[in-house]
Amino acid sequence: MLKRTPLFDLYKEYGGKTIDFGGWELPVQFSSIKKEHEAVRTAAGLFDVSHMGEVEVSGNDSLSFLQRLMTNDVSALTPGRAQYTAMCYPDGGTVDDLLIYQKGENRYLLVINASNIDKDLAWMKEHAAGDVQIDNQSDQIALLAVQGPKAEAILKNLTDADVSALKPFAFIDEADISGRKALISRTGYTGEDGYEIYCRSDDAMHIWKKIIDAGDAYGLIPCGLGARDTLRFEAKLPLYGQELTRDITPIEAGIGFAVKHKKESDFFGKSVLSEQKENGAKRKLVGLEMIEKGIPRHGYEVFQNGKSVGKVTTGTQSPTLGKNVGLALIDSETSEIGTVVDVEIRKKLVKAKVVKTPFYKR
């Protein structure tokens, strides 16, 4: 039996087509992926992201515990601020990438990938020491994302909270949004400005409908996982299971900014990640643009002069560029912009070149 979010019953009303996404029955699209993608780039889109996991970490030793688990410097946070980070294994491979919200003194909300909830919880509990409480709140919290250049104007119609004053990665807790309480943060996974709204599961349907109504005049439409994927891909935001895995480090995946290897506290993977940060990693995530016809898909092998140099992690026809492009993890010596490589597509070698990323920047 596939898991469902609190908004499942609304999908059909908006024409949602569902798929199995890591054990969840979620909408891949409502209208078309291209239309939804373009709405987010030019106006606004509304996503149900309630499958994501939310875990509260509290207690007097919560900061030292998080510093040991996270690659970023959690001590830099203050209440009302969020941070993007990764958790790594001792060998530098990635457990997960996540957001940490500091809600108060010794109170943090961790937002983790849906497919990793059980694994992440087990990893955290295994390494918890001292006064640390780990509370999985995933079933009680729903998550909606309003993304796009019109997101701010839309939300201003629904809340008295000063959403326009929020800087990226800042949030307002216990904000009133159309009569319901929610945490509103200026974060997202699309490469656009936008907000993520964490509310009680019971309030999700009410808030969804209010956002749809308020957004109608601005061109907001409901969006599915398909557009979420093409949007994050163009912005070179990694997806766990593709750009980040047990065998790929945050440095290799291009999120070295979330690795503070000089922070005082020791953390899992520190020696490997420090070495990669100081001297460069052997592999690098690069952009590929096809020279010849074909789309570079996840898992396709990349060659140079007949030698395998890596694999495509994500690829598609970019709705914004109208070109067939991909992200690929390849040997660093073949990662220079302009380098010509071959992608194996249906047993044929097809020419591509290494290009600048991200493919899209607002």
Curated annotation (Swiss-Prot):
Pfam families per UniProt = GCV_T, GCV_T_C
Q: Which cysteines are joined by disulfide bonds?
A: none
Top-level taxonomic group: Bacteria
**Can you cite a GO biological process for this protein?**
glycine decarboxylation via glycine cleavage system
Q: Does the keyword Hydrolase apply?
A: no
Reaction(s) catalysed by this chain, per the record, are:
N(6)-[(R)-S(8)-aminomethyldihydrolipoyl]-L-lysyl-[protein] + (6S)-5,6,7,8-tetrahydrofolate = N(6)-[(R)-dihydrolipoyl]-L-lysyl-[protein] + (6R)-5,10-methylene-5,6,7,8-tetrahydrofolate + NH4(+)
Enumerate the GO terms in the molecular function aspect. aminomethyltransferase activity; transaminase activity
Name the EC number(s).
Answer: 2.1.2.10
Its keywords, alphabetically, are: Aminotransferase, Transferase
Q: A cellular component term (GO) from this record?
A: cytosol
Of which family is this protein a member?
A: Belongs to the GcvT family.
Subunit record text = The glycine cleavage system is composed of four proteins: P, T, L and H.
NCBIfam families attached here?
gcvT, PRK00389.1
Q: By its UniProt entry, which HAMAP family does this protein fall under?
A: GcvT
Q: Which PANTHER family match?
A: AMINOMETHYLTRANSFERASE, AMINOMETHYLTRANSFERASE, MITOCHONDRIAL
Task: Give the function comment from the record.
Answer: The glycine cleavage system catalyzes the degradation of glycine.
Know the name of this protein? Aminomethyltransferase
